[in-house]
Design a protein with these regions (language model features):
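N-terminal secretory signal peptides that target proteins for export/translocation
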Residues: 1-2
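Sec-dependent N-terminal signal peptides
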Residues: 5-14
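C-terminal segment of classical bacterial N-terminal signal peptides
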Residues: 14-21
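Surface-exposed edge beta-strand/loop patches
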Residues: 22, 35-36, 90-94, 122-181
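Low-complexity, acidic Ser/Thr/Pro/Gly-rich terminal tails and inter-domain linkers that flank the onset
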Residues: 26-62
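N-terminal post-signal-peptidase region of extra-cytosolic proteins
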Residues: 50-57, 68, 127-132
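The feature marks short-to-medium sequence segments in extracytoplasmic or secretory-pathway proteins
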Residues: 61, 74-140
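Short, solvent-exposed loop/turn segments enriched in Ser/Thr/Gly
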Residues: 63-68, 142
């Protein structure tokens, strides 16, 4: 009799665990607030912030919104892959304004460890260009600033930034997160 009770309890526990898993799946986006640190692996730390940074020469039809991904990888450094596109369906980093996805219009990469190669140029994203992604290697601190053209009718709606990044070195790990701005 006792064996049957233990067996039933074990089956019940496994059924409950399968129906209500406790752990987050690897590709489920983590929800964070602006300013919170997101960790990828043991060496890469990312903080997302709104910014008043200007993107000179880039015209927007709606409201300009700049979001900065501040990164720190320490002396060991990191190699990171991300995919940006002016088409929100193809971009792995985009702004959610209400129910609308807004793709970035331009990007500035600022990584002091690049030395003279750190030109901080504004790269305008072309909707016709469907290039794969960007791989960058850096040490210590750096940032990626993104300009979004938010339609005027969405200027008062809550904003969230959806981000999918892959750290290639020193270990291979992908992370998705959504930041409430």
């Amino acid at each position: 009799m006792m064996r049957k009770v233990v067996l039933l309890a074990a089956i019940f526990a496994m059924t409950i665990n399968a129906a209500f898993p406790q752990s987050r799946s690897a590709d489920e986006a983590k929800q964070v607030r602006a300013g919170e640190v997101v960790r990828i692996g043991d060496t890469l730390f990312i903080r997302v912030m709104k910014s008043a940074q200007a993107f000179a020469g880039i015209k927007v039809k709606g409201e300009a919104m700049v979001v900065v991904l501040e990164m720190e990888a320490g002396k060991q450094g990191a190699t990171l892959f991300y995919k940006l596109n002016a088409n929100p369906a193809s971009s792995e980093i985009y702004l959610l304004s209400g129910a609308r996805k807004v793709a970035p219009r331009a990007v500035i990469e600022d990584f002091p460890s690049w030395g003279k190669d750190n030109d901080k140029d504004i790269d305008s994203l072309d909707p016709k260009e469907t290039v794969g992604g960007t791989t960058l290697t850096f040490q210590q601190k750096g940032s990626i600033a993104l300009l979004f053209d938010v339609p005027l009718e969405d200027s008062k709606t809550p904003k969230k930034l959806s981000v999918a990044l892959r750290m290639v070195q020193p270990m291979d790990e992908q992370r998705s997160f959504v930041v409430s701005l």
